[in-house]
């Protein structure tokens, strides 16, 4: 057994500059908002530019990854659970509305980890929560993930500008280092991403799907251990 989700051993690590959202709940809005600005019901809101010139993962000092949540043990029919709750007041990080958030982590008897989100607000406001886990299927402490094999059910992606804001175009992955329609080792073509701001993979892929129902969108495998991570949507 190995710990395949990366993080720190103490609170100090999570409070340090080394913490890039390891395992946290991000929000109020995950990912980037261009120029930190949005309009809602005729009102323009200017958010903190913590990833200048954009707003990233909810802002600066009071984004959801930096505040203290209230923890409470909760009954679960199929395992053990803990509920984390937080009240984000109106105007926090310049977002409108009071927002009451519950995030419930359940460890089931089948060794499944289930994360459930619930948010209630008293006025219209954007909310887009996610978990920001980092995975290394070789185990925490392994030096690289570049030996992992990735396959995506995605023949297209959304190109982004130099600040990682999508341009609005939808482009094909064929003939580019972003082509994972067939299984490919992560390190094989990552060096070709010379136009990426981070010289690596940080892209939005457009999933190929037909009809309704749950489908597999991604499969990641570590050859050395045989561990596999699948993403369903």
Regions from the PLM with identified roles:
Residues 1-233:
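An exposed, glycine/acidic-rich loop-and-rim segment of catalytic or binding clefts
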């Amino acid at each position: 057994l190995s710990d395949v989700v990366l993080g720190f051993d103490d609170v100090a690590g999570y409070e340090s500059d080394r913490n890039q959202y390891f395992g946290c709940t991000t929000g109020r809005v995950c990912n980037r908002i261009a120029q930190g600005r949005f309009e809602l019901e005729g009102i323009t809101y200017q958010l903190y530019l913590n990833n200048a010139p954009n707003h990233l993962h909810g802002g600066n000092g009071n984004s959801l990854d930096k505040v203290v949540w209230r923890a409470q043990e909760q009954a679960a029919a199929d395992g053990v659970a803990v509920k984390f709750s937080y009240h984000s007041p109106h105007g926090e990080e310049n977002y409108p509305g009071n927002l009451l958030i519950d995030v419930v982590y359940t460890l089931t008897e089948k060794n499944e980890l289930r994360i459930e989100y619930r948010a209630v607000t008293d006025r219209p406001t954007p909310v887009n929560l996610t978990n920001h886990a980092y995975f290394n299927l070789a185990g925490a402490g392994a030096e690289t993930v570049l030996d992992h094999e990735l396959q995506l059910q995605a023949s297209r992606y959304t190109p982004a500008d130099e600040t990682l804001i999508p341009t609005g175009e939808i482009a094909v992955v064929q003939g580019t280092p972003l082509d994972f329609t067939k299984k490919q080792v992560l390190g094989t073509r990552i060096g070709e991403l010379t136009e990426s701001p981070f010289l690596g993979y940080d892209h939005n892929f457009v999933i190929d799907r037909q009809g309704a129902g749950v489908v597999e969108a991604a499969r990641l495998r570590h050859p050395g251990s045989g561990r596999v991570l699948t993403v369903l949507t």
